[in-house]
Curated annotation (Swiss-Prot):
Bias (Acidic residues) ranges: 375-393, 549-558
Listed Basic and acidic residues bias regions: 313-347, 365-374
Family from the record: Belongs to the UPF0329 family.
Disordered as annotated region, ranges: 312-410, 531-570
The protein, known as: UPF0329 protein ECU06_1610
Compositional bias (Basic residues): 353-364
Biased composition (Polar residues): 531-543
Length: 607
């Protein structure tokens, strides 16, 4: 929550330049966030808002992510050239590209301080810099031959052009901060004067750093490395979906906070330039930096010693596994070649002629019977029972007949459901009883109010209908498998929007699975995890990360849910429309009244 609050506050200040001093502004901002998140902010979170509004923020280094979204579609990837962009989206992309010089400048110069004088200076430096000979749209559209510019190339070029403003801005910051230090009012208390001077000295030091050649080179180098890392990620299809989903989740979040912004420009991310550059120079590996970028975009991690060490370990582990598979594939190919050579040798008689194979008596008849059996099996396998929505959960958990062509997906096309998932379908009182008497310490002692809030997030068993459908892969991304508590586990993650009484939350739909004793897939975790909400529980793991907060799972605690029926009067319906799978829960006493709905969003279409 801390990272998201800080990021959004800085972004909103940079977009609107509003005066954010005073208790009233803290209260207004608190209400704005609570309305967007549909939850009460903690005292710690309110303090983050207060500090962000009345103290300096934005001194951290940032980068720009070379992706452009529009209406839940990715319309320009890092490697997209102008001709690659869908003609219907070109006008919108051009609109974003025209904003790139300012967006790139904001990523470098956005500093928020009481009175907004830092923002005014940022605007003034940008407006008084001549760009009359530079049109980013023309540069992007009219580059020719092999040198046709990709979006990532355009972003780096814009950062290079913007670099001429950095020294002037840094000098202005340092100079104005010194003037304000000298003019601190003597009417302030000693504590207030000290706090004011410390804040201004931080700004002055930041301005002086911006004037150094080393810092200016780092700005460009860090952005270039970032773009190269994005290109590396984009080339690996197994990373592409989760990368796009992680970025799109942030877009949805920001549009919920600030729906007035009609341009979905490239995202800003707080990344330590020096650590990123040092990591690249130390390991000479863009794959390690790409792993770090994935952690920032997908898992919301910062670049620090721990995340760097984790990235190095994961890349080495992946490369070792890839090498092992390549060697195994080579051995299999060599063995196959030797077998073919032996068969050729054995197939020749003393005169070098092949031996004639005789068929067995009755072989033709047996073959015909076998064909008839195969046809019968195929017909039987193609039968799929239609069930009412109220019994969907049972159908979703019970293995169903599959067409023979779909057997390759058999591992994930049917599921058993663990009792820790089923318990959330019960009454709040019963759930509390089971949690208080269960083995998971984190759930013990929860209040009825807390459990009621968690039930809203966890009681989404209807998602199983989507999991077992042929469209599942259009919505969910499968994460890598890992071992924990003696079981092989993995996750499936989708984007979602939960609407409860008109209050919307954006987040991830998480499905946790493990391999059961009979090699079946068992769902042991199912929930909607709102972005930036303490309702999910402190210390909860990121949706796309390996690992979870469930230590041990009782393997015999799963069910196929045969015979399950919803409690009397409860109604839910599933609607598929325009790239989303929507579950609607209605009031049992008045089915015209919607209690809540969950829209599972299709993975952003890549144009």
């Amino acid at each position: 929550m801390r990272m998201w609050l800080g990021y959004t506050l800085a972004l909103l200040a940079g977009l609107h330049g509003s005066n954010v001093e005073g208790t009233n502004e803290v209260e207004k901002t608190r209400k704005r966030f609570e309305k967007a998140f549909s939850c009460k902010l903690s005292d710690e979170e309110v303090e983050i808002i207060r500090k962000s509004l009345v103290e300096v923020s934005g001194l951290e280094t940032r980068i720009l992510l070379p992706l452009i979204f529009h209406d839940r579609k990715l319309v320009a990837s890092p490697v997209a050239k102008y001709r690659d962009i869908n003609e219907r989206e070109r006008e919108y992309v051009e609109k974003v590209v025209r904003l790139l010089p300012y967006l790139a400048w904001r990523s470098v110069a956005l500093v928020c301080a009481p009175g907004n004088w830092t923002l005014f200076l940022m605007y003034d430096v940008f407006k008084t810099t001549s760009f009359k000979d530079f049109d980013p749209v023309v540069l992007y559209r009219e580059s020719k031959g092999r040198s046709r510019m990709r979006l990532m190339d355009l972003v780096v070029e814009i950062f290079k052009r913007n670099n001429c403003m950095v020294s002037r801005f840094g000098q202005g910051l340092a100079r104005e901060a010194e003037v304000r230090i000298q003019g601190i009012s003597s009417s302030l208390s000693a504590m207030e004067r000290k706090r004011e001077e410390e804040m201004l000295r931080k700004i002055k030091e930041h301005g002086e750093r911006l004037c150094t050649k080393k810092n200016q080179e780092q700005i460009i180098e860090a952005q270039k490395i970032m773009c190269d890392a994005c290109e590396y990620i984009w080339k690996r299809e197994e990373n592409r979906k989760s990368f796009v989903m992680g970025a799109h989740l942030k877009h949805l979040y920001l549009r919920m906070i600030d729906p007035s912004n009609d341009v979905e420009g490239p995202l800003l991310y707080y990344i330590d330039h020096e650590k990123m550059i040092n990591t690249y120079e130390k390991y000479k590996s863009i794959s390690i930096v790409a792993e770090l970028v994935k952690k920032v975009v997908i898992e919301y991690e910062d670049i620090n010693d721990e995340s760097i060490s984790s990235a190095v370990h994961e890349v080495k582990e992946r490369e070792s596994e890839e090498k092992r598979r390549e060697e195994e594939s080579l051995r299999n190919a060599e063995e196959l070649l030797r077998m073919e050579e032996r068969e050729k040798g054995e197939g020749k008689g003393p005169n070098g002629k092949g031996k004639k194979k005789r068929g067995k008596k009755g072989a033709g008849k047996a073959k015909e019977e076998s064909k008839e059996e195969d046809r019968g099996e195929e017909e039987e396998e193609s039968v799929e029972a239609e069930v009412p929505v109220e019994e969907m959960a049972a159908e979703g958990a019970r293995p169903k007949k599959k067409r023979s062509k779909e057997r390759s997906k058999g591992e994930d096309s049917c599921y058993r459901v663990h009792k820790r998932v089923l318990r959330w379908m019960k009454s709040v009182e019963r759930i509390k009883y089971e949690l208080d008497n269960g083995k998971e310490e984190k759930w013990k002692g929860k209040s009825m109010e807390e459990i009621e809030g968690q039930k809203v997030l966890h009681d989404i068993i209807e998602v199983l209908k989507l999991l077992r459908s042929r469209e599942c892969d259009k919505f969910f991304v499968r994460t890598g498998k890992y071992m924990k508590g003696g079981s092989e586990r993995w996750k499936m993650v989708a984007l979602g929007i939960l609407d409860e009484g008109g209050e919307k939350k954006v987040g991830n739909v998480e499905v946790g699975l493990f391999k059961g004793k009979r090699e079946e897939s068992v769902v042991y975790h199912l929930m909607f995890k709102p972005t930036s909400s303490e309702k999910t529980g402190k210390g909860s793991s990121p949706s796309f990360g390996k690992g979870d907060d469930v230590d041990e799972i009782e393997e015999d605690g799963s069910s196929d849910m045969s015979g399950f029926q919803y409690p009397p009067g409860v109604r839910s319906e599933v609607v598929k429309d325009k790239g989303e799978f929507r579950i609607v829960w209605r009031n049992p006493k008045d089915t015209s009244s919607v209690l809540r709905s969950l829209a599972v969003l299709q993975i952003p279409e890549i144009q």
